[in-house]
Amino acid sequence: MHCPFCNQTDTKVIDSRLVADGVQVRRRRECQACHERFTTFETAELLMPKVIKQDGTREPFDEEKLRNGLQRALEKRPVSVEAIETALHNVRHYLQALGEREIKSLVIGEKVMEELQNLDQVAYVRFASVYRSFQDISEFRAEIDRLQKKPDETA
């Protein structure tokens, strides 16, 4: 690492510690040439995969699109902004952990539905109705029945 004071490359790490809930490393460094000290922060650069749409086209992952979809489903529901941000983080982390360069939009949609199911079942049904293109009330009823049976299966 170049010293910001004298531009020499011979620096030594004096101290390292985790910050930002373990997502970042703070390093205290000392230049071996001019003996000035400075701080650096390191984070992992994880790239989001490209999204393969249902029609086969590819586009960059758009976090804003994901946020808007969650907010639309959760509109006028008693869910905190923090809970929404946690759900967004969970989806991003899941996609990064897959380690794929490209991922089908179907995988993202299913993960979003999983997160919504844990947050608010009404929002889940709203999202599912659009995502799965419900055509009539019987499809809503079937999804609600499935939701009601799910807790019994895990008990």
Swiss-Prot record:
Keyword Chaperone: no
Molecular function in Gene Ontology: ATP binding; DNA binding; zinc ion binding
Zinc fingers typed unnamed, residue spans: 3-34
Domain of life: Bacteria
Alphabetic keyword roster: ATP-binding, DNA-binding, Metal-binding, Nucleotide-binding, Repressor, Transcription, Transcription regulation, Zinc, Zinc-finger
Pfam families the UniProt entry points to: ATP-cone, Zn_ribbon_NrdR
Stored InterPro entries: ATP-cone_dom (IPR005144), NrdR-like_N (IPR055173), RNR_NrdR-like (IPR003796)
Cofactor binding description: Binds 1 zinc ion.
Cofactor needs: Zn(2+)
UniProt GO BP: negative regulation of DNA-templated transcription
Domain ATP-cone, chain residue ranges per copy: 49-139
Alphabetized PROSITE patterns for the sequence: ATP_CONE (PS51161)
Presence of keyword Zinc: yes
PANTHER family: TRANSCRIPTIONAL REPRESSOR NRDR
General function of this protein: Negatively regulates transcription of bacterial ribonucleotide reductase nrd genes and operons by binding to NrdR-boxes.
Family membership noted in the UniProt record: Belongs to the NrdR family.
Name of the protein in its database record: Transcriptional repressor NrdR
Gene that this sequence comes from: nrdR
